[in-house]
Regions:
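Phosphate/ribose-phosphate-bearing ligand recognition and processing surfaces
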Residues: 8-108
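Glycine/small-residue-rich phosphate/adenosyl-binding loop
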Residues: 1-7
Length: 108
């Protein structure tokens, strides 16, 4: 188990976005450095800490996917563990948006 403590949302005035991204990045780095091949994440900071779900999902999806691109074959499995259908649909939309943005980067 790798434990991370997410930032408390304070309107975005205290680098919360950067801190949240670091939670995902550092957890993945620690797992990779210790030979852990699977990892599961909740929606960090979106409960009691009040981070907006849509923003948190975009940060999470972007950070995790960029890490995987930069560290090919580092994980066999990465999963989201989401506790309600609203959060699940927000993460699905963030994944779809990320993939569409990535496909726009290809030049032929």
């Amino acid at each position: 188990v790798i434990h991370t403590v997410g930032p408390i949302w304070n309107g975005g005035r205290n680098r919360e976005e950067e801190l949240l991204a670091n939670c995902y990045f550092n957890s993945m780095k620690l797992a990779m450095d210790n030979g852990i091949r699977s990892i599961a994440f909740p929606s960090i900071s979106t409960g009691a800490y009040g981070f907006p779900v849509e923003l948190a999902a975009n940060i999470a999806v972007h950070t995790v996917n960029r890490f995987l691109q930069d560290n090919l074959n580092s994980f066999d499995l990465v999963e989201w563990v989401l506790f309600d259908t609203h959060t699940e649909s927000v993460y699905e939309a963030a994944e779809k948006s990320y993939m569409e943005d990535e496909s726009d980067d290809f030049d032929f």
